[in-house]
Amino acid sequence: MVHQYKLNGYNIVLDSCSGSIHVVDDVAYDIIAMYQDNSPEEIVKAVSEKYAGRQDVKEKDILDCIEDIKALIAAGKLFTQDTFSEMAGTFKQRSGDVIKALCLHVAHTCNLNCAYCFASQGKYHGERALMSYEVGKRALDFLMENSGSRTNLQVDLFGGEPLMNWDVVKRLVKYARSVEKERGKNFRFTLTTNGMLIDDEVIEFCNREMSNVVLSLDGRKEINDATRVDYAGNGSYDRIVPKFRKLVEARGGKNYYMRGTFTHANPDFTNDVFHMADLGFTELSMEPVVCAPDDPAALTSD
């Protein structure tokens, strides 16, 4: 499968099955887009019409580009076949129905009102609710009972905002720690948080019990505060950044990462990555927004 996109003036072609990334000019970008569904003659005609008047785009140049594409295909670097497709249905069979990870939705609610939230402010288009300790405990028992001979088990504490169910989070981690040795298991917990409820107790707990912490920040203050707001419409940047910096500093090199979302409002999101790096954060991830195509935040060709 080939993905094509434009970023910061570059034409990028990603061949996902080989992992090859190509940075190409406009002509090659267009030819690659047409390559699988058009004959060489049709490509020459369409490209010649589009770039009429350009002295560097003649029929020979177009045909040379087509030959270059053929060479990349032959080398397994473009339009590569998915060699794993036939195995996809056998993964469950080969795993022996073993479960090794669990995402616990401990808080079906949130204290932020982010405009682009795919989870509808943590409610997932339902009613606000918090997971009970009993349900969480049964989920951890289920994971252990169905993990077979696996020792390391991953549990993600998610929401909504999981710190809104703080007491249950602490009790569930305590329960897991109390039984993991006798069950021959090792729990690795990850917490995802928007940072609003972080305090010294949370920092100490996370740095003791969490194998990883995911901290939500969209980068520059003006970008973050355009969407990541509370229910009064106030931005969150000034309240969460000091807490994130304190947590990361106290973490002493343990795993964490800043998790940002880029939208139609910040196609220059590399500047948000640089901003977070300037704040002292070294583990960074920016992900595209997940929303309906007609949402104002949606990423479009515009």
Regions found by a protein language model. Name each.
Residues 57-72, 79-82, 86-204, 209:
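Conserved alpha-helical substructure of the radical SAM core
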Residues 119-122, 221, 290-295:
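A short small-residue
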Residues 38-54:
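Short acidic, hydrophobic short linear motifs in intrinsically disordered regions
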Residues 136, 140-156, 165-291:
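Radical SAM/AdoMet-radical enzyme domain recognition
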Residues 125-126, 223-228, 294-298:
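A short acidic, helix-capping loop that chelates divalent metal ions and anchors anionic groups
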Residues 1-35:
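Acidic, low-complexity/disordered tracts enriched in E/D and polar residues
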Residues 61-62, 295-302:
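A C-terminal junction/extension of Radical SAM enzymes
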